[in-house]
Amino acid sequence: MLKLKQQVFEANMDLPRYGLVTFTWGNVSAIDRERGLVVIKPSGVAYETMKADDMVVVDMSGKVVEGEYRPSSDTATHLELYRRYPSLGGIVHTHSTHATAWAQAGLAIPALGTTHADYFFGDIPCTRGLSEEEVQGEYELNTGKVIIETLGNAEPLHTPGIVVYQHGPFAWGKDAHDAVHNAVVMEEVAKMAWIARGINPQLNHIDSFLMNKHFMRKHGPNAYYGQK
């Protein structure tokens, strides 16, 4: 697990680097599908002092199998998403300012331009609010369940992120670094959408044909963006 712990550590350290977290907010995980183990950031450990060896390894039930610290308080959310979506290799949760503002407003982040369409096929959805019973019960597990409820049977890598109502953004990807990359983009397009709607409150969504072109040229079966 040393390689995966190093990858998860580096991905977690990218969160303050890209301005996505304050203090100890936020966490990144990655999964070893063959072994059924997840590596995740320890709860409440400062980024300035954190080391790769501090990463916590848990099984799919959340039991710690390696590590001296307690895992992130959001571990149950990560595990629920890994169980539901086999294509996910890494997950990140932050409270980045603009994406969290959309979550607090209870609004999806609208697809307004090609920057958004290069990564997200349509609006970045916002979940419903959790009930008092869901919050007082298994809160983190139920957060995962409400994300799944919102995504349904959609391919999660086509819209690799969501905002949880009154909480904040979750993003995911093929691995931990890909998940962080998508979280950075989510924050940027959330900021762009806020600015654009401030300039033009009547601004419509991106044209569907333009969105399709930009997403498919990067992610479709005949993608041609970048190098092979």
Swiss-Prot record:
UniProt binding sites for substrate: G26, N27, S43, G44, S72, S73
Record keywords: Carbohydrate metabolism, Isomerase, Metal-binding, Zinc
Origin: domain of life: Bacteria
Cofactor(s) of this protein: Zn(2+)
Cofactor comment: Binds 1 zinc ion per subunit.
Family: Belongs to the aldolase class II family. AraD/FucA subfamily.
Name used for this protein in its record: L-ribulose-5-phosphate 4-epimerase UlaF
